[in-house]
Amino acid sequence: MDIVTDKNIGSNFLADSNNRIYILIGDTDNVIDKYLVSILGKIEFYYVYEITVEDSKLINTFVTSNLLCPIKNKFNIKIYHDYKKVIGSCILNVDGKFTRYKDPSKLHVYVFCYRYNNCLNTCTMVKCHELLYPEKEIIVDGYKINDMSFFYTNPEIIKQHTDIKDYETLYKNIFLRRELNRVILGKPSDLIETLKEIVTINSEDIWKVIVSNDIFDSRDVIKLINFDYDREDFLSFVRAWYSNQLNNCKEDNNKIEKVYEIVRNSI
């Protein structure tokens, strides 16, 4: 998957037979604006969904569209295909406003639909507007944690620290970043399954990650896009490493097992 800074994104976007999916990280509204200007005359309709976390699961909610379905009062490309045949056309939303969303506890999914050779194609933008960082250090088992990627293996730890300002928002932000990390690295992800409820995704789709230039070289971004935080893989490594430390000294082994349990419960 190509990873670029928004500074390197030009003003000419392709609107061809390939469906495209862009993962936007940081304040990247300029990318959305460039896209709209570039293919404005070709867009047949658009819609926006938001993805957030409830009960440790991803949920998606319809936000808006320039078309409204009279039957369901919400819209996506699958509904469009179903009801276009039945009702002839959906209702044009004359509001005319296009909103850029910035809530860090949600991913916002913008789907732009256009026709190419009489086929309907999509350009999907999945935006994580901000990589949150707590105002105070988080202490886990006596250790100061100043790297938010620590929580990618187990975001639930954040919910234990209710003294952190807006800890629920931080928890959701970390949870969503963990899911983005899995998508970027090509790992199985609940986020992919959630996106499939919003837009058609095929193996031939072209993916790209676009990062705001002001955070492109930051530690948070580097770890988000480069490192694997699969919890089971981490547990396997930790188990093997600590097992290799065991010896014939019972006292040493008890210390090793105690530390192992602390680490295992923190992952």
From Swiss-Prot:
Database matches in InterPro entries: Poxvirus_D3 (IPR007660)
Domain of life: Viruses
GO CC entries: virion component
Induction: Expressed in the late phase of the viral replicative cycle.
Keywords for the protein's UniProt record, in alphabetical order: Late protein, Virion
Leader peptide range in chain numbering: none
Transmembrane segments: none
Subcellular location: Virion
Main location: virion
Role of this protein: Late protein which is part of a large complex required for early virion morphogenesis. This complex participates in the formation of virosomes and the incorporation of virosomal contents into nascent immature virions.
Family membership noted in the UniProt record: Belongs to the chordopoxvirinae D3 family.
Protein name: 27 kDa core protein
Provenance organism: Canarypox virus (CNPV)
Species classification: Viruses, Varidnaviria, Bamfordvirae, Nucleocytoviricota, Pokkesviricetes
